[in-house]
Every structure is written in C-alpha cells, then in structure tokens.
From Swiss-Prot:
Alphabetic keyword roster: FAD, Flavoprotein, Nitrogen fixation, Oxidoreductase, Plasmid
UniProt record, GO biological process: nitrogen fixation
Isomerase is among the record's keywords: no
Any one GO molecular function term: oxidoreductase activity
Known cofactor(s): FAD
Keyword flag Flavoprotein: yes
Protein family per UniProt: Belongs to the ETF-QO/FixC family.
Function recorded in the entry: Could be required for the formation of a functional nitrogenase Fe protein. Probably accepts electrons from FixA/FixB and reduces a quinone.
InterPro entries with a match to the protein in the record: FAD/NAD-bd_sf, FixC-like
Protein name: Protein FixC
Residues annotated as transmembrane: none
Length: 163
C-alpha cells in the first residue's frame, strides 16, 4: 500500500480573459490557472490547463527542433497557437462576464437564485389557488427585489456580456 505524506491545494483564479497576464518571455511560458486560463462560466479549468500545457510544449519543441533559442520572440509562437485554439476563443467570448458578476455579485449570486428558487416552488405548488395569482405574486417579487429598471438593466448587461 501507500501512505499520503502531503496535501496541497490552492485557490483557482477566475479573472477571465481580461486578467490573463503576459504568457511568455525570455526563457519562460505560463500555462493553466497560473495564466488565468479558467472559464468560470462553464466551470472549466483542467482542460484549459492541459491544452495550454500541450501547446506550450509543442511550441518549445518546434523552436528547439529548428535550433532556436527560448527568446520572447520565438516563444510568441505559443501565444499564436493558443489564440487559434478553443481556449482563447471561449475565454474571449465571455470576456465581459466576470466583471459583470463581480460588480453586481449580490444580485447575481444571492437575489436572483433566491427569486428563481421561490418562483420554481410556486410554479409546481399544488395549493388550490388560481395560478394567475401565483404568477402575479412571483412577478411582483422580482420587481420588488430589483425594480423593473433593475431587471431590464441586468438582462441587457447579461446579454451583452454573454454574447
């Protein structure tokens, strides 16, 4: 058998596309979550880390194969490969979403989940009351919590960020 000698853990950054640091320099590349390559929208990270590591390795292999040095200019090949991959395309698609969620986190992580949960309960509740009353009460709870303008604003900002 084996015995565990050490445990390790770390926080996973979720800054998104706009938080990606410099990915390469003279003699170095950054991959995975160290490069902020996490897609918080789709809860992806491991696949992005593996793909970025693979691409960094391929870039380094190509540079070494032609006798090149690990200069910033040569290692820019890694950034180009990453830019053509699904990794950057997906992160770019949702580039504005992290800032929206961080700016208005209480509504997106507390208010809306609570309202949606209550609406779902109201929708399936069998209590003998006319559903029109339940639907009006549910709509009123959303308006009371966020106002009509707040709901419209959140919907538009979400749609723009989600594009």
């Amino acid at each position: 058998g084996s015995e565990i000698k050490e445990y390790a853990a770390h926080l996973i950054p979720e800054g998104g596309f706009k938080a990606i640091p410099q990915l390469f320099g003279n003699g170095w590349v950054v991959v995975g979550d160290a490069a902020q390559l996490n897609n918080a929208v789709h809860r992806e990270g491991s696949n992005l880390a593996m793909t970025s590591g693979l691409m960094a390795g391929e870039a380094i292999f190509q540079i070494k194969s032609r006798g090149g040095l690990m200069t910033k200019r040569n290692l820019s090949l890694y950034k180009g490969m990453l830019g053509k991959s699904f990794v950057m395309k997906d992160l770019m698609k949702h580039k504005d979403l992290p800032s929206l969620l961080h700016t208005d986190s209480h509504n997106f992580f507390m208010t809306y989940p609570t309202l949606i949960s209550q609406a779902a309960q109201n929708f399936v509740r069998v209590d003998g009351a006319p559903k029109i009353n339940t639907e009006k009460a549910t709509a009123a709870s959303f308006i009371n919590a966020r106002s009509r303008w707040g709901l419209i604003s959140d919907a538009v900002r979400s749609a723009v960020s989600w594009r």
